[in-house]
Regions:
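Gram-negative bacterial Sec-dependent N-terminal signal peptides
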Residues: 1-23
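N-terminal maturation segment of proteins
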Residues: 24-460
């Protein structure tokens, strides 16, 4: 599973840097220009839209190593989301106005993919998917805490930027509560049983104080570039912000979820239970697969694949002397040799398989990632709800490695049988290889380097 520990929110204003002249030119003028000028107009508009994305998704910018907005959170308010819809519609109009006749296949594809991305953003807003900001896997409360591992802490300014962000957490969470209340009014609610897990998660993040907080991790290892006097100041001010800004904000959010939000959660887990649930399901399938297959077709394909794979597994089970697949699974589950002996045992197995695969890569691939990959334990606050493992991308320049977060909780009941395949899936030659190479391909515009088409990404891995 590939995830991004961030809050990507849209913006009020686009950048006025690279494409100001294009913005001023009438759409008809752009459409009628010669091929070279129209390609130039497309590239300038792509650059403008990319700057817009970074400016208005500061967490995303930080993850990519662009630190211009490293001291702020995305604007999570309803007003901002509404304004961003207008901005997105304007971008769409301008991209569609560019005549791509005579363009190279690459330039045509750049325009087509951007148009698709913008249309998807508009559909998502119109289906009110932004009105469910809290869930147990990628809710805002989890995203902020998990984001700490993606922030650089190389100098005093980066620590001061972090301090500014911590002090702004109460405002961000107030915006989240406003969005959640709008979702309550519109019946756009996550399942109740999952929201009850959110309450537990928030509590586990809020309770640890001072240096025990996940937000205090950067204070445990100051780089030599931060002077001793600044270390003392930052240590004291960051701890104060954690205890006086961050933790009270989490406490307030937790009380809201427990008292107001979770009780209103939907009783049916399926997305079809939402208003326009069928339309949302169709949109999700279309967006994640980039095909025109219906949900029913995708479901039928899934059932067919499960039947095929279980047939192969049953044949293997019988070849090992078992009557059926169920008895084979029961035997594996009860065998102590198939379970981890400690948290470190799980981490070491992942690291061992990745090290084993590394020298094999040149035999299979011509281009290899320059960015390294590291294995880290999932943070304690999300162990109970996290997947077995997940990948967080590194920076394009390799200054921060790709990270495989491994769930080591309840280790005695975790099977080691899937660790090898999962290590390859999340790391190399899976997510880390594909994403690290993609985000450094020189001939692609940044939005394509960072594109996240689920069926492709998961299919590759």
């Amino acid at each position: 599973m590939k995830t991004l520990p961030l809050l990507i929110c849209a913006s009020l204003l686009g950048s006025v840097t690279l494409a100001s002249s294009v913005q001023a030119a009438p759409a008809a003028q752009i459409a009628k220009g010669d091929v070279a000028s129209r390609v130039q107009a497309l590239n300038a508009l792509l650059a403008e839209q990319w700057q817009h994305t970074l400016q208005n998704s500061p967490e995303f910018a930080t993850i990519l190593g662009d630190l211009r907005y490293n001291d702020r959170w995305s604007d999570l308010s309803l007003a901002h989301a509404a304004a961003e819809r207008k901005t997105t519609a304007d971008f769409l109009k301008r991209f569609e106005a560019i005549d791509t006749s005579g363009f190279s296949d690459t330039d045509k594809l750049n325009q087509q993919l951007m148009v698709r991305q913008l249309k998807d953003s508009l559909k998502s807003y119109d289906l009110k998917l932004n009105e469910m900001p809290l869930d147990q896997m990628s809710g805002v409360h989890i995203a902020l805490a998990g984001f700490v591992s993606s922030i650089p802490f190389n100098n005093t300014k980066e620590y001061d930027d972090y301090l500014t962000r911590l002090r702004a957490v109460p405002k961000a969470f107030d915006q989240v509560i406003g969005v959640a209340r709008k979702g309550m009014a519109d019946k756009m609610m996550p399942p109740k049983y999952l929201l009850e897990k959110v309450v537990t998660q928030i509590d586990s993040i809020e309770k640890p104080a001072g240096m025990d907080s996940v937000f205090a991790e950067p204070l445990k290892h100051f780089p030599k570039t931060v002077a001793a006097a600044d270390q003392k100041r930052l240590h004291d001010e960051i701890l104060k912000a954690i205890d006086e800004d961050v933790r009270p904000a989490y406490r307030k959010l937790g009380e809201f979820v427990a008292r107001e939000y979770a009780p209103q959660g939907r009783t049916q887990p399926g997305i079809w239970a939402l208003p326009n649930g069928d339309a949302i399901y169709r949109f999700d399938v279309e967006q994640m697969t980039t095909t025109d297959k219906t949900p029913a077709q995708i479901h039928a394909l899934g059932l067919s694949e499960v039947k095929r794979i279980e047939g192969e597994m049953t044949r293997i089970a019988k070849s090992q002397g078992f009557a059926d697949l169920a008895s084979f699974r029961a035997s594996l589950k009860s065998n102590p040799a198939t379970h981890a002996t400690s948290r470190e045992d799980i981490l070491n197995r992942y690291r061992g398989f990745l090290a084993q695969m590394q020298p094999e890569l040149p035999k299979l691939f011509g281009i290899l990632p320059k960015t390294k990959v590291v294995v880290m334990p999932v943070e304690a606050f999300r162990e109970k709800s996290a997947a077995a493992a997940e990948y967080h991308q590194g920076t394009p320049d390799g200054s921060r490695p790709g990270q495989i977060f491994v769930n080591t909780g309840d280790f005695a009941n975790r099977s080691v049988l899937t660790i090898e395949s999962t290590a390859y899936h999340e790391g190399i030659p899976g997510h880390h290889l594909q994403i690290s190479i993609a985000q450094t391909l020189p001939k692609l515009p940044p939005f394509r380097q960072q594109a996240g088409y689920t069926a492709y990404i998961e299919g590759w891995a």
